[in-house]
Amino acid sequence: MNAVFATLRKNAGVAPLLAFLAIAFFVPVATVLSLALWSPAEGFSLVALKRILLTPVYSTTLLRTLEISLWTTVMCLLGGFPIALLINRLRGAAKTSLYLLVLLPLWTSFLVKSFAWLVLLGKNGAVNALIMALTGAPASGSLLFNLNAVLIGMVHGLMPFAVLTILPVLDAIDPRLTPAAASLGARPAEGFIKVLLPLALPGIAAAGLIVFVTSVGFFIVPALLGGPRQTMVANVIIEMVLDLLNWPLATAAALLMFVVVAAMFALYIRSFGIESLVGRGRTLRQSGAAKELSRQRLEFQRRCWLAWDSVVVPLGRLPLLPHLLRHSLWLGPLLLVLFLALPALFLVPVSFTVSGIIDWPPQFFSWRWYAALDTPTWRSAAWRSLTVASATGVLSLAMTYPAAVWLVRQARRSRLPVLVLMIAPMIVPRIIIAIGLFYLFARIGLIGSWLGLVLGHTVIALPFVLVTMIAVVQAYDERLDQAAAVCGAATAMRLRRVTLPLLAPGALSAFLFAFVTSLDELTIALFVTGGLSSTLPKQMWDEALLRVSPTLAAASTTIFLFMSAAVLLAQAVRQRRSPAQRTT
């Protein structure tokens, strides 16, 4: 009995988080996926899966989802790596400014970004206005509701994830390696391909995995910017559950989506190890995953060098091309950063238009669309979103801090299985989590409740907060506590004067991450509210399905300014850290 209590005390830090995930994540997801293979009336059955695979409209939608997700992933990596490399090379204020320009669209709502592209790509939008100004030809029509619009919206929304996943890996690479390769006779391109690119491969692969998993579960961008031919699996699942109440087909589609994502995740884990996904890839053993990674790096290096010799080197002999390439090394990433940062700004002037439609240029000046937000419906949705986001941040922080301490102090073999369980919600598409919670909450009376929203949003936010808190705990030097104890400080004083001040900036960043994730979350709200209540994203979604009006631009501008303030606050807190903390 004493041994049991000792084990419980030793693992007390991780127990609450695992118990929460077991109840609010693993059980709902496993239950809802099992419905695709089993029903109380028929028992085990593959009818729903066969119908999904053999019905042309469903199988085509599945293949289209994979195609759009793959294209999105490739374009995010091709654009995100140069941006991350440029940020890595910069120093001082320039690096901070560029980092903020990438961070701001990351924390901007997907709905806001989609509405921005409605303004830009519409028939009377800014892009058509620019084309008319440059060519003098009248607009040929809307640039919306096609594959190009969907890809633009998805790449714009997900490229910041790729940048911020690759950047820590680049920062961890010793900057002396490339000059060392040059001193041994390697050309700049050769040093890049044979040294830098293979070392950055784990970060590139992690970014690809995160972008692909998120893309597979996307429904906002295809619904707002795409047409019927751009319908994705998540859109089909939403229609089947909320409109048709066809649970067998919905869960069969979800199961196929889960199988694809699980296969990608297993391939990543086999190649790079789970810890590389949370920024601890350097702890790989020199057997198994590490040897496989070394082999893949060599093969990747060989293929890159063959492509360089067969394509880029012959092009380099063309006049002026080397000069253009040198300038594109910084100009291209800067243009991509502007592509990420500027679209949301177009919503600001549109929110002050006199016109009742979204067009460009807007007809100034009116506050009527902001006044339209001052209604009980919008106020209630905003208040519910703020309170749910605050509770999500507090609950996530309360569970992840002790779990992060436990993970950092455990041996690698002990922590790896637990780490896989804890970050699982980051890998499973949100639409699957949402229908799982909907199925569970409908049976225990939490549909439409404030608590149901908090629990659902916490499931989504936990992996991201955990990764942040692991970095915070790793950076904390416990010798400072020991030094304070030697100087006679009691436990309460050490906690108040040493531990909390040093952990507070990182904890605040983690809280803001959970807060913003909750504030932007639509998928969970779409199911868990059950039409009985509304959050701000769901209210905006319902309005957009009825009519896209400048009211949405006003709401989007308000959210955008609020998110911008949160980003600037987090950056200000980060810059005010003490010198002692920066060195820990």
Locate each region found by the language model:
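Membrane-core helix-loop-helix motifs of multi-pass transport proteins
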Residues: 224, 233-259
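Short hydrophobic, aromatic-rich alpha-helical segments embedded in or entering the lipid bilayer
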Residues: 41-54, 129, 229-242, 361-372, ...
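Membrane-helix/interface signature in polytopic inner-membrane proteins
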Residues: 167-182, 187-188, 470-480
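Membrane-water interface segments at the C-terminal ends of transmembrane alpha-helices
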Residues: 5-41, 54-171, 195-219, 226, ...
